[in-house]
Amino acid sequence: MREILHIQGGQCGNQIGAKFWEVICDEHGIDHTGKYSGDSDLQLERINVYYNEASGGRFVPRAVLMDLEPGTMDSVRSGPFGQIFRPDNFVFGQSGAGNNWAKGHYTEGAELIDSVLDVVRKEAENCDCLQGFQVCHSLGGGTGSGMGTLLISKIREEYPDRMMLTFSVFPSPKVSDTVVEPYNATLSVHQLVENADECMVLDNEALYDICFRTLKLATPTFGDLNHLISATMSGVTCCLRFPGQLNSDLRKLAVNLIPFPRLHFFMVGFAPLTSRGSQQYRALTVPELTQQMWDAKNMMCAADPRHGRYLTASAMFRGKMSTKEVDEQMLNVQNKNSSYFVEWIPNNVKSSVCDIPPNGLKMASTFIGNSTSIQEMFRRVSEQFTAMFRRKAFLHWYTGEGMDEMEFTEAESNMNDLVAEYQQYQDATADDEEEDYGDEEEDEVAA
């Protein structure tokens, strides 16, 4: 019941995905051969959300892995959990996308997309009641961004009523891997606004800060960053996989978090974040969790929620705790910081409680917020985009693959519209609405 199909694309997506499956296997007591070696029936009760049971009692992840070059996939395959995936579900090309969105979306990626869709279709047909898809990718490169968005739009055509959730790694403000990141990211956002239902916005710099400041790691690796992401990913779906007192699923999440269809870019956070050494020395309380998960330093993307307002938010608690306490704490946050919530959406914080905590913790919580301050991310990418596009820098790489400059202009204006929409709702107040109504009534009287 309620299966989720996981898709990972490009180098970044595959590395996050590999880490994610380590976390999920750990939670469900699956070892690296796919055999169950856990100690609780609860681990098996809804294991079919993420796993297919194959012959001989092996559990195979419902995962599709794609890339345009074989390198990252080989390292996933030879990694600790590489043998657990279905070999047919590795779909890869040889040529690579070379950080070029057009190659991923129009040329190289388009040649490979049908074989990816076949695998997706095969996995979807294996599902009893498919709830939706979760896609891991980055927006700065070529494959994850170009081919990732192509796949999302194709899946959208074929499964229009299923949820589409993405974990998208945005280019960081100060750290840049490639010079054309702003192009790739803008073209991708243009697609994600239209075709995805929910986007969890991540970025490396914010993750580095968390590792460095909060976790006290001297030299964080991508592995550490990906571990943070996968903790959040696991938290988002824990209610589907374990029994809870207050359930949520992808669709409930969307209904509670998205007031206007285009504004579906969320900030995510996770608590407790404590350095590996100090974990066993403290007992966590619900107030501590709540305080940490609402903390701006805890957000996994480089936007500061204090610069905007929350349209909506959702908190998923895991562990044995009283729902009364959870409700009190959430109410407390809203009352104390009421200026950071828009007043024209009452009760805009949803909470859910799942009884089973992640391994090694007594309780944990995942935070998802729809804040207008996310526009900082888009604004920053847009500025970098404009700076290059004004000079038509690097454009020949894209036009050479058959793209038109018009497409860039469209993507740019779509992104600017998005920023403007967030700004509009940030400034909106409850009185605006009433004034409008007042005017209309007067007009009617005059008429």
UniProtKB/Swiss-Prot annotation:
Tubulin is the major constituent of microtubules, a cylinder consisting of laterally associated linear protofilaments composed of alpha- and beta-tubulin heterodimers. Microtubules grow by the addition of GTP-tubulin dimers to the microtubule end, where a stabilizing cap forms. Below the cap, tubulin dimers are in GDP-bound state, owing to GTPase activity of alpha-tubulin. Dimer of alpha and beta chains. A typical microtubule is a hollow water-filled tube with an outer diameter of 25 nm and an inner diameter of 15 nM. Alpha-beta heterodimers associate head-to-tail to form protofilaments running lengthwise along the microtubule wall with the beta-tubulin subunit facing the microtubule plus end conferring a structural polarity. Microtubules usually have 13 protofilaments but different protofilament numbers can be found in some organisms and specialized cells. Expressed in roots, leaf sheaths, and suspension cultured cells. Belongs to the tubulin family. This is Tubulin beta-5 chain. One of its GO terms (molecular function) is metal ion binding. Induction: By gibberellin and brassinolide. Down-regulated by abscisic acid (ABA). Mg(2+) binds at residue 69.
